[in-house]
């Protein structure tokens, strides 16, 4: 995976929520663009969401790139919210990318920018622990301030 000359450390960390049922899907989201079509906005995360989404349907390949994908659906409402890049193609691996393989459609999720430990500034990817994982209870305890922003 190529991240040379690419930096994502100044991007805000977002809590990703399903637009259909408001379920929190991930606490480690990042705004991104589709490598195959940079006009398409989406969100991505680096850690598989736990107990919030599951695979649905069969694997498929994209038309432009040869990545192997599988759709993911919200476990609460059942709507498709994105996809997982099961096998990225060499073109995507060699391009500037953030290393995230869990993608969320901007039409299906919304992001809430997380605050850092001061509660004043937005949390940035450069300050986020690589192995941070939240339990379901922790994700549900989102402060009112984070919802307002």
UniProtKB/Swiss-Prot annotation:
Tissue specificity, in the record's words, reads: Expressed at high levels in stomach and also in kidney and, at low levels, in heart (at protein level). In the stomach, highly expressed in foveolar cells, parietal cells and chief cells (at protein level). In kidney, expressed in endothelial cells, mesangial and epithelial cells (parietal and visceral epithelium) around glomerulus (at protein level).
InterPro entries in UniProt: YPEH2ZP
The scientific name of the source species is: Rattus norvegicus
What does UniProt list as this organism's lineage? Eukaryota, Metazoa, Chordata, Craniata, Vertebrata
- What Gene Ontology cellular-component terms does the record carry? cytosol; membrane; mitochondrion
Q: How is this protein organized at the quaternary level?
A: Interacts with UNG.
A biological process from GO = positive regulation of apoptotic process
Could you tell me which Pfam families the record lists for this protein?
A: YPEH2ZP
Compartments, record wording? Cytoplasm; Mitochondrion
Question: Which keywords are on file for this protein?
Answer: Cytoplasm, Mitochondrion
The main location is: cytoplasm
Source taxon at top rank: Eukaryota
Q: Which gene encodes it?
A: Fam72a
Give the function comment from the record: May play a role in the regulation of cellular reactive oxygen species metabolism. May participate in cell growth regulation.
Q: What is this protein called?
A: Protein FAM72A
Q: Which family does it belong to?
A: Belongs to the FAM72 family.
């Amino acid at each position: 995976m190529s991240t040379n000359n690419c930096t994502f450390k100044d991007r805000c960390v977002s809590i990703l929520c399903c637009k259909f049922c408001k379920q929190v899907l991930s606490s480690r989201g990042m705004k991104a663009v589709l490598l195959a079509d940079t006009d398409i906005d989406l969100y991505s995360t680096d850690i598989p969401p736990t107990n919030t989404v599951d695979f649905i349907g069969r694997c498929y390949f994209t038309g432009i790139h040869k990545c192997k994908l599988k759709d993911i659906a919200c476990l609460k409402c059942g709507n498709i919210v994105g996809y997982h890049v099961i096998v990225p193609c060499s073109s995507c691996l060699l391009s500037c990318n953030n290393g995230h393989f869990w993608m969320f459609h901007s039409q299906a999720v919304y992001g809430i920018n997380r605050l850092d430990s001061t509660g004043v500034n937005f949390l940035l990817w450069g300050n986020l622990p690589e192995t941070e994982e939240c339990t379901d209870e922790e994700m549900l305890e989102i402060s009112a301030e984070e919802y307002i922003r």
